[in-house]
């Protein structure tokens, strides 16, 4: 719905700049690079079983979702939302009370988004995070902190010094707002920090970045690891604990060898 609403909305530089799908994939890739256990969900799902929810460019906010997001954070979850989020409701009508999402989400995130700057390619906007300088790309929201902690601020233009990224404790959890579009390098750094703060460990430790790993839990509580080699070369790595190779039926192993573009399924009994 957010994609359709964005595409039907004039402004924001046109659909060639909005790039909703590319943005979602980029955030997913940044989390995937940390070998996190990921799931793609919609806003109607049960949020309670997750520690961290990332909502990039959630432009359209259905009725009742803001209350459920507040409940999720209040109960200990961490929510990360980005620029161009919660601008319209399910009827494509703007929210009263300011962005993001009117009074409810303004309270949750502790910010007010006054405006959004569409960055021309020749304009360089930057911000600093964890001692490193990063480039803003395409979009930079002009934010005001209303109780939120400023994690990063802009370095230039008329809104220099205003927040680019914020965080606010709410109940037992935390709401983080990324008001700027960035390259993958920042997202990888940022989500690495956020995953650690949330206590989310990698699915498997020390897995090469060239491998894709996902985990699912069986009805008996056993853990199943689906591992794909995404390279044209052989990959070898040592497992952090013994696992049964049920795909190749080679029994319990402690070291995995995958051929080029190979795959396997490993099982850990409970």
Model-found features: residue ranges?
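Carbohydrate-binding surfaces of carbohydrate-active enzymes
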Residues: 1-270
């Amino acid at each position: 719905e957010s994609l359709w609403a964005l595409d039907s909305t004039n402004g924001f530089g046109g659909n060639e700049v909005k790039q909703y799908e590319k943005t979602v994939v980029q955030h997913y890739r940044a989390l995937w690079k940390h070998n996190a256990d990921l799931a793609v969900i919609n806003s109607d799902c049960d949020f309670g079983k997750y520690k961290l929810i990332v909502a990039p460019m959630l432009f359209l906010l259905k009725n009742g979702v803001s209350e459920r997001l507040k409940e999720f954070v209040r109960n200990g979850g961490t929510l990360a939302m980005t620029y161009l989020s919660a601008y319209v409701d399910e009827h494509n009508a703007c929210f009263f009370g300011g962005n993001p999402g009117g009074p409810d989400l303004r309270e949750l995130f502790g910010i007010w988004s006054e405006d959004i700057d569409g960055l021309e390619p020749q304009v360089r906007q930057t911000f600093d995070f964890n001692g490193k300088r990063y480039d803003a790309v395409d979009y930079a929201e002009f934010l005001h902190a209303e109780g939120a902690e400023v994690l990063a601020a802009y370095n230039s233009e008329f809104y220099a010094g205003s927040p680019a990224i914020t965080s606010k404790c709410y109940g037992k959890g935390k709401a983080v707002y990324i008001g700027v579009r960035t390259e993958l390098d920042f997202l990888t750094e940022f989500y690495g920090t956020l995953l650690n703060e949330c206590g989310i460990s990698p699915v498997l430790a020390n897995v090469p970045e060239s491998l894709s790993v996902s985990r699912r839990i069986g009805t008996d509580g056993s853990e199943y690891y689906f591992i794909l080699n995404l390279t044209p070369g052989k990959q070898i790595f040592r497992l952090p604990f013994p696992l049964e190779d049920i795909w190749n039926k080679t029994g319990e192993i402690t070291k995995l060898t995958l051929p080029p573009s190979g795959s396997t399924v490993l099982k850990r009994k409970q």
